[in-house]
């Protein structure tokens, strides 16, 4: 098959070995797949995957790795032991994991392990155990970005926001927008969004329901928080969703955050970063790194997208073919372009 292949630190579009469905696997024709910032992190920080003690990810420079973990596909084949739940022609998606020995041996992240090849190719293998059929008229591209929106759902659910608390979203990329969408679905008001890019700030409001937009080059988001809290006579703390992952940002938030803020670090891999425990202690902060999305978040968001109660498509700004992926990955590395770029590996643009 043709695919975007990572090998020895280089990304090329070429032929690679077709995936073969194993016991209980479905073989899919990839219909739509999205680029995520974690694809770039995986490429740029291979040492983290070479030395991943969990075994969930692995970077091997001497093996072809097909990245991509946000996808939807059409069933075109079955491995041994599959049921009849997903006939040929069924449109399916899945959480991006492959179970090892039915889960007894852990799991692999699809698109971040040579034994769990990803969706930046014409074909893809997923476990029947995690697959879910996609019915209805919802577009392939909307399904392809479910994973990103499940991230925001997970962090917002984990935050357990209380009356009087004010959410602050730092970064209006796909994950930041997903957090805005999850807050909006819960009727939270006000929602403060901070991003350097005016277009992304406006998308957070027009596409997903944010109320107050902040340009961090012009003013501190925490100054805005204090002003809003005073104007609305709210007594709750700040609940911060950090959705950027830039080096040094967490430490800056820790230093500037209001007393007793809760901080949810959704931005990704904080490679080599440090933070001041002294400042965090003085400010009485609660912090969470990673941990999701969980299946209830992922499949719950999928159900919402299929039902039409969540429309993630405003986050999609480009649809490309495989040949354009290397350039698009570089664009994502620079935090340029739309929040989500979607790929149609089989050419239906």
Predicted regions and their residues:
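Short SAM/SAH-binding signature in class I
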Residues: 237-241
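NAD(P)H dinucleotide-binding glycine-rich loop of Rossmann-like/cofactor-binding domains
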Residues: 57-64, 69, 96-170
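Glycine-rich beta-strand-centered segment in the early N-terminal region that forms part
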Residues: 19-33, 48-98, 135-137
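Glycine-rich phosphate-binding loop and adjacent beta-alpha segment
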Residues: 188, 244-307, 345-349
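Short amphipathic alpha-helix with an adjacent loop that forms part of the alpha/beta core around
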Residues: 219-234
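Mid-domain Rossmann-like dinucleotide-binding core that forms the NAD(H)/NADP(H) cofactor-binding site
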Residues: 136-218
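C-terminal hydrophobic helical "lid"/dimerization subdomain
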Residues: 227, 251-255, 295-349
């Amino acid at each position: 098959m043709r695919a975007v292949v990572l090998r020895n630190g280089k990304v090329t579009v070429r032929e690679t070995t077709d995936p073969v469905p194993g016991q209980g696997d479905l073989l899919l024709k990839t219909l739509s797949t999205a680029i995520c910032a974690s694809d770039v992190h995986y490429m740029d920080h291979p040492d983290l995957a070479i030395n991943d003690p969990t075994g969930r990810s692995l970077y091997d420079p001497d093996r072809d790795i097909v990245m991509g973990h946000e996808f939807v596909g059409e069933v075109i084949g079955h491995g041994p032991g599959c049921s009849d739940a997903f006939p040929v022609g069924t449109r399916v998606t899945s959480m991006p994991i492959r179970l090892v020995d039915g889960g007894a041996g852990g799991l692999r992240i699809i698109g971040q392990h040579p034994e769990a090849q990803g969706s930046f190719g014409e074909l893809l293998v997923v476990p029947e155990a995690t697959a879910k059929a996609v019915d209805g008229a919802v577009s392939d591209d909307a399904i392809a970005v479910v994973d990103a929106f499940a991230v925001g759902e997970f962090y917002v659910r984990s935050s357990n926001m209380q009356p009087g608390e004010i959410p602050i979203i730092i970064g209006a990329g796909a994950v930041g927008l997903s957090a805005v969408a999850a807050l909006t679905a819960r009727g939270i008001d006000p929602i403060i969004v901070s991003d350097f890019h005016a277009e992304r700030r406006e998308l957070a409001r027009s596409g997903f329901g944010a109320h107050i937009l902040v340009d961090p080059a012009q003013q501190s988001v925490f100054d805005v928080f204090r002003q809003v809290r005073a104007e609305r006579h709210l007594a709750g703390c700040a609940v911060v969703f950090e959705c950027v992952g830039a080096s040094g940002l967490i430490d800056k938030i820790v230093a500037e955050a209001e007393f007793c803020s809760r901080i949810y670090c959704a931005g990704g891999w904080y490679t080599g970063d440090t933070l001041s425990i002294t400042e965090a202690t003085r400010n009485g902060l609660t912090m969470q790194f990673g941990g999701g999305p969980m299946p209830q978040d992922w499949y719950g968001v999928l159900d919402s997208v299929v039902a039409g109660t969540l429309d993630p498509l405003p986050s999609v700004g480009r649809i490309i073919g495989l040949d354009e992926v290397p350039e698009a990955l570089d664009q994502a590395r620079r935090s340029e372009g739309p929040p989500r770029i979607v790929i149609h590996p089989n050419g239906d643009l």
